Amino acid sequence: MSLGTTDIASETGDDSLSAITFESDIESKTKRKSFHKPPSTSPKSPYYSKPRKVTSWRSLKTAGSMPLSSRMSLTPQKLWLGSSKQGSVAQPPSPTLTSEHAWTHPPSCTPDYLTEAVRAKRADLRRSGSHGHVSGTSVYREKEDMYDEIIELKKSLHMQKSDVDLMRTKLRRLEEENSRKDRQIEQLLDPSRGPDFVRTLAEKKPDTGWVITGLKQRIFRLEQQCKEKDNTINKLQTDMKTTNLEEMRIAMETYYEEIHRLQTLLASSEATGKKPMVEKKLGVKRQKKMSSALLNLTRSVQELTEENQSLKEDLDRMLSNSPTISKIKGYGDWSKPRLLRRIAELEKKVSSSESPKQSTSELVNPNPLVRSPSNISVQKQPKGDQSPEDLPKVAPCEEQEHLQGTVKSLREELGALQEQLLEKDLEMKQLLQSKIDLEKELETAREGEKGRQEQEQALREEVEALTKKCQELEEAKREEKNSFVAVTHEAHPELHAPSPCSRHSEPDSDNSAGEEGSSQPPAPCSEERREAAIRTLQAQWKAHRRKKREAALDEAATVLQAAFRGHLARSKLVRSKVPDSRSPSLPGLLSPLNQSSPAPRVLSPISPAEENPTQEEAVIVIQSILRGYLAQARFIASCCREIAASSQRETVSLTPSGSASPPSLRASPGVIRKELCASEELRETSASEPAPSVPYSAQGGHGDCPSSSSLEAVPSMKDAMCEERSSSPRSAGPSLAEPSPPELQPLSPPPVEDICSDDSDDIIFSPFLPRKKSPSPF
């Protein structure tokens, strides 16, 4: 299609150019026809004499000397015309030749009047020659003129042939374009092609003419389709099978009335010849009355049927919506006589209640046009033979009043039943809503109970696991302490010169070396110093063990105290949210502390009604406290192992050097160690002294702490446990003194408070004591 469009564009361009040239050719052609005439038949042939070609060659010569621009615009025909046809009647073909007229006519010496006379003569001769040769008159023409005319005719013939060729080419192009356009029109009119093809053609064509033609074709097709649809609709409307039953009924009624009217007219027209005019008038009046009565009756019947239909619909709706449908449903199974009897009974009841109304209604004359079901059959009978006296007997008023009364009673019953139904529906909706609310509350209560049970179970399992871990850690701690005591007990007899005091013993060793050269010290002095050093070591070791145990017990008591405070705060919070819950009992909580396990198992007697963030926060606080305590216990155990291993290495490394030292040098470190250990004991007691009470805000982060009366049992329990634990090092004191000499057995170790040291700058190695745990940020 793109090639076709380019071809069409090129062809349209060529046609435009050819059309311009064609118009110019037509203009020149018409101009040539105005002065080119067929040659006159002369008796003398112009070919007997030789023509003179001076002027023609002169004109050609002058044309050759012309510039190129003017030469392109001149044709040989114009040159010949300008050179030889100076006396012709025709004017120059274009205004451009006026400028050429000056050089195509060379100047001559003949006067103007002679040239004008010659021109007039030649014009007369040509006019006479054009009308035909007249016998007896001779036409004289010069050979030069005849020759010029022949040349002009040949030139014109040649141009005509070129014009014919050009027209043939144009004709061929136009035929091709017409055939192509015919094909495109056939494609556009093809119904198998969709509108997309037309759109593509319109888009590819540069001009809007194709779009307009395509849209016109589309409009034409749409109009044809609309006409077809209208024809089908008209056929369906006129078809008998598609008409409405109500319309058919109305049409039949009108047809029946028209037939009846025509019958009456026919009967009246037949009886006109026999009856007088008075009877005719009476018959016409009676016919009018009958027709009006018939119309009124048909209208009344139609209204009654509509009312009956609406009442039936209301009754069906009432029966379907009423709750007492089980009672009324039996009427549907009754037979027609039974229903009629029931209606008669109801009518009697209504008539008994409305007896005064009936007496007044009987006095009134019945209307002949009363609406009653018995009038339905009247319209189907011919009314020609009926008289106006028979009409009042058609519809009794009594039956109509009975029916109206029954209808009123039924409507009242319907209203009452509908009100009852609405009340019952409202009650049922309220009951259903309350049932749904109760079910939701029950479901939430069940879910809360289930979650509470699961939480209690998880807390119990976690508490059991934590107590087991605490027991295991306490046992491991005891074993490590026992092993450390055994190692130190084995290492005491060999500790003659401890390494931490080596720098203090250096000057003593120098002094002793100086004294050794002069005189030897007495033996009893060295033995006394050794005994004093042994007693100092025993006292320091016992004090260290007692402090270590007290620090561990204080730490455990602090942790338990914080846990109990968190538990009491949590129970207080739960008690404030659940008023009917029982208050926690502190003796029940503290009873497991009297057992042997260091970390008692505390079970919460109060189960919260529902999970809340404060309860979870309290549980997290207790868990963090217990985990911190376990981590501290592990760290203390690892430190004890390292201290035991380092003490064993020191005793092994110091045993040979200590045995080689003299007695005087062995006794001096004992005194120094006694003083240094006393200062270390004072520092450790000040550092490891536990706080009497840890605020609950530091442990759990809550502001409401339990009262002091509820926590009195915790310090007392702590003191009792400390006394039980402190009794073990007192009993272990003599066992540590067993490796000492027998004369030192009755000596009792001095109290820690009596040992004092003025030298606080000296540093000795002492076993590691656990730091006091800082208050937990939880």
UniProtKB/Swiss-Prot annotation:
Query: Which residues lie in Pro residues bias regions?
Result: 739-752
Q: Which SMART domains match?
A: IQ (SM00015)
Q: Give residue spans, biased composition: Basic and acidic residues.
A: 672-686
Keyword presence, NADP: no
Specify one Pfam family: IQ
Name the UniProt record assigns to this protein:
IQ domain-containing protein E
Low complexity biased stretches: 37-49, 352-362, 581-598
- The residues that cross the membrane are none
Summary of subunit composition and partner proteins: Component of the EvC complex composed of EFCAB7, IQCE, EVC2 and EVC; built from two subcomplexes, EVC2:EVC and EFCAB7:IQCE. Interacts (via N-terminus) with EFCAB7 (via EF-hands 1 and 2); this interaction anchors the EVC-EVC2 complex in a signaling microdomain at the base of cilia and stimulates the Hedgehog (Hh) pathway. Interacts with EVC2 (via N-terminal end). Interacts with EVC.
Alphabetized UniProt keyword annotations = Cell membrane, Cell projection, Coiled coil, Membrane, Phosphoprotein, Repeat
Q: Where is the IQ domain?
A: 553-582, 615-644
Species the sequence originates in: Mus musculus
- Topology with respect to the bilayer: Peripheral membrane protein
Subcellular location per UniProt equals: Cell projection, Cilium membrane
Q: Where is the composition biased (Polar residues)?
A: 83-101, 651-662
Residues modified as Phosphoserine are S322, S661
- InterPro entries according to UniProt: CellDiv_DevSignal_Domain, IQ_motif_EF-hand-BS, P-loop_NTPase
Q: Which GO terms describe its biological process?
A: limb morphogenesis; positive regulation of transcription by RNA polymerase II; protein localization to motile cilium; regulation of smoothened signaling pathway
Disordered: annotated span: 1-71, 83-108, 348-392, 443-462, 474-529, 573-612, 651-778
Q: Name one GO cellular component term.
A: mitochondrion
State where it is primarily located: membrane
Sum up the protein's function in the record's words. Component of the EvC complex that positively regulates ciliary Hedgehog (Hh) signaling. Required for proper limb morphogenesis.
Note the coiled coil stretches, chain numbering: 157-323, 398-486
